[in-house]
Amino acid sequence: MGAMAMVEQEGCVENRQPLAASSSSVSDGSSYGGGGGGLAQMSPPVSSSANSISGLRRTSGPIRRAKGGWTPEEDETLRKAVEAYKGRNWKKIAECFPYRTEVQCLHRWQKVLNPELIKGPWTQEEDDQIIDLVKKYGPTKWSVIAKALPGRIGKQCRERWHNHLNPEIRKDAWTTEEEQALINAHRIYGNKWAEIAKVLPGRTDNSIKNHWNSSLRKKQDMYNTSNNMVVPKLLVHDKFKDKPKLMAMEGHLDLNKAPIINSKDQPGTAHRSNCSGFLSRSSLPTAQPLTSREASVVDGSAVTLVAQALESDSVRGKGLEIDSVHEKGLEVNSAPDHTGNSWTIQLEAAPSKGEAELSLKNEARSLGPLCYQIPNMEDVVPVSSSLFSDHLTGNHTSEHCGDDILSPAGCTTPPPTKGKLTSQLSVDSILKSAANSFPGTPSILKRRKRDKSTPVSASEMKISGSNTDRFYTPMGMEPATATPESFKTTSFLSLGSLDGSVKSFDVSPQYRARSKRMALTKTVEKQLDFSSDGLDTCGSEILNSSCNNSQSTLSITEAPKLKEKEHAVQLENLTKNFAHTTNLDVT
């Protein structure tokens, strides 16, 4: 057994020397396999090669460690060495690998190559068992705790506890103070997350590393030199003479719309720019309290902000100087540069509401017909209503004429009314007025206008009195005839002349003439049906009314004859109208 151990040791020494490994015929696996005779025959060359290069080996100093990854050949050699030594003597196992230590071999076997190692996710039973064991042994004896968890090593249990199971771990969102502390600690320690975790209680090194790499490292460019991570809000006090205003981010004036900047040697140019629309409070330099000459400016205005920004030391160092500050703006002058040129900026404050309205009125008179003023809702008056005729044509006419602006085309802009209406009109009255004046209302829907000024006596209610009735047609007012069928054919006559004499109402194209005539024929047929259905009732009522008003002496026996006669006349008239319409459609 002693000879066998000596041969194995010599084989491992040979593997530690690259020159011996290339010259010797003994393979790495020869020391773990084969019979004793084979090893005995190969032992003399191994010992001679080891003695020949023993002087090249270092006898002192630290052991060189391989920094590269493990190759498949090294993994296979490690498996055989662990199997030979039963995984107990790691110092002898490490002697079989050049530039590998026993710690490297042990970790490689425990973390990677061990077939009993569990690399999957943690189960709830394992987490509960770790929590119970930590309560019993404390968060230090991880090798003892790992023995209770088959397939897990002490390092896995420790990382599971410190990164996930520890109740002191903070899993909420990162605060501003924590991020600022992380930035400061990273400047000191770099990527030493365990050291940084000591500065941030409740945050694990793993969570710190993830938060830094995911989001916080990208925000470093936005931090200023004063290490203020979050831009403070603008604080505006009532009296800025006593308390300074905290402005955000020391830098330059951020003007979204660049002002017009001209040099002083160019006369005749206006140095104006509106500062109310492009001043950005979030990017003004850190300002100092203003002097007494700027104290008259209104607090919180845009001019105040610009004046404070230009009074700061960072801006004064660039040769900028405030020439004058007033309520409507300020003037900034620059020192001459190396070329001898300087420039001036005049920043004007936003005008008040009254000044803006006055300027708009002045511009309206100067622009002439190019200006249009939008009327208010309470000033809009329905043109078609007759109730507003006095309001539009009364005393206000002279006032409106003074405000009207004639355009080159002869059109005028309607001026707004000077005052509101004194009488509030109801919705019904406005709708009725609009309906009566609507030109597209069909005449069949219009009511007959009756003279209701004086009551009609019973003696005047005769058939001849019906001549005072009127109905609307496209040709104008038409008198009503005394016959009952005239009332039934009123809507038919209101459709217009059938001979085509009136051309002003026919706006349809010629290809639609037939369809229009067919629709007219259908309308007449419907009216004939309606007239024949209500002929008896309507005719009897008119007949009785005329007989009673004229005090006729017709007897009861003559009434049926008169009724038949009137019925025949009505049918004849309606038949003529229908025949005329049919002939028109055929033509």
Swiss-Prot record:
GO terms for cellular component: nucleus. Residues 14-74, 441-461 are annotated as: Disordered. It comes from the Eukaryota. It is found in: Nucleus. Induction: Induced by cold, drought and salt stresses. Transcription factor involved in abiotic stress responses. May play a regulatory role in tolerance to salt, cold, and drought stresses. Transcriptional activator that binds specifically to a mitosis-specific activator cis-element 5'-(T/C)C(T/C)AACGG(T/C)(T/C)A-3', found in promoters of cyclin genes such as CYCB1-1 and KNOLLE (AC Q84R43). Positively regulates a subset of G2/M phase-specific genes, including CYCB1-1, CYCB2-1, CYCB2-2, and CDC20.1 in response to cold treatment. This is Transcription factor MYB3R-2.
